[in-house]
Amino acid sequence: MVRSRWKGIYVAKELQNYNTVTNPTIVTTERSSVIVPYYLTKTIYVYNGRKYVGVKITEKSLGRKLGEYVLTKKVEKYKASGKSKKK
């Protein structure tokens, strides 16, 4: 579902008040925050439930959410067992 226009975009308070002059690394757990132009060319470390993953902000990522770039589940690949079936 799309967020109502009258509510505006959601940016976490911890990201709004972040001062990159004193602390250049931005670390957050707010995956639902929208990426705004203030964060262009910066790297934000987002928590995926296990570790912090770096997300580099570009012009293409503006208006999207931080959680779209951080996977929370491990991608499993099926491996061949190495045994061939006999006919």
Swiss-Prot record:
The keyword Oxidoreductase does not apply. Keywords: Mitochondrion, Ribonucleoprotein, Ribosomal protein. Its main location: mitochondrion. GO terms for cellular component: mitochondrial small ribosomal subunit. The keyword Ion transport does not apply. It is found in: Mitochondrion. Disulfide bonds: none annotated. InterPro entries: Ribosomal_uS19, Ribosomal_uS19_CS, Ribosomal_uS19_SF. It comes from the Eukaryota. GO terms for molecular function: RNA binding; structural constituent of ribosome. One of its GO terms (biological process) is translation. Belongs to the universal ribosomal protein uS19 family. This is Small ribosomal subunit protein uS19m. It comes from Dictyostelium discoideum. The gene is mrps19.
